[in-house]
Amino acid sequence: MPTTLDQLNAMDRVGFAAALGGIYENTPWVAERAFTARPFASVADLYAAMQAAAASAAADEQLALIRAHPELATKVARASALTAESRREQGSLGLDRLSDADYERFERLNAAYRQRFGFPFIVCVRRHTRDSILDRFERRLASSPDEERAAALAEIGLIARLRLVDAVDGPGKPKTDGRLSTHVLDTVSGRPAAGLRVELAEIGAGTEGLL
């Protein structure tokens, strides 16, 4: 059951950090530092305070935050050695139910990435499909260490925003989705076409499915 913003505003530092400690994977100091900005008028204000705490942390603290996140779709993940939040997120894309061949592909990428950068590949899986994650994985291996450190922190912020929206009830939640509009022109009449059914499909590496 979500915690309300009013409840969070009434908590002491220990309770506040305990309630929000999982928003930034096993890193409760982010919530502890955001605590000083209470009371929060909106969930968006709370998120901004937590992001500010992470962004202003020392370099070694940020690296520890990055390293607190699990690798994607490893045999360790298969054995359920994940936080509840990460398990749900990876499970939503079936990353805990891959074939042995797919697990081996992820493990090769995980090993190559960790060897190059010294920390796990991080992506907000709830904003991706399995194919887009693999594509992003391959492309980011070519980045510089500084670029990947910045990318990892940005993805952590996206993960935290979605987790916070799920975990806290209150006014002014940060935006977590967007809009897609489709315009079909009737070229004979020069007016928008009416009565057409539009279906969106994702086409990936050997897969295709309606969205």
Model-based region annotation:
Residues A151-P174:
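Charged phosphate-binding loop/patch that engages nucleotide di/tri-phosphates or the phosphate backbone
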Residues R114-R149:
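Long, amphipathic alpha-helical coupling/dimerization segments that relay conformational signals between
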Residues P2-T3, L72-K75, R127-S132, P145-I156:
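Non-catalytic regulatory/linker segments of enzymes
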Residues F16:
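Surface-exposed, charge/polar-rich loops and edge strands
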Residues D166-A194, L200-I203:
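Beta-strand-rich domain onsets/edges
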Residues M1, M11-D12:
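N- or domain-start disorder-to-order transition segments that initiate the globular core
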Residues L5-A10, Y24, W29-L109, R163:
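Aromatic-anchored, charged helix-turn/loop surface patch used as a conserved interaction hotspot
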Residues A205-L211:
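Short, acidic Ser/Thr/Gly-rich low-complexity loop/linker segments typical of extracellular
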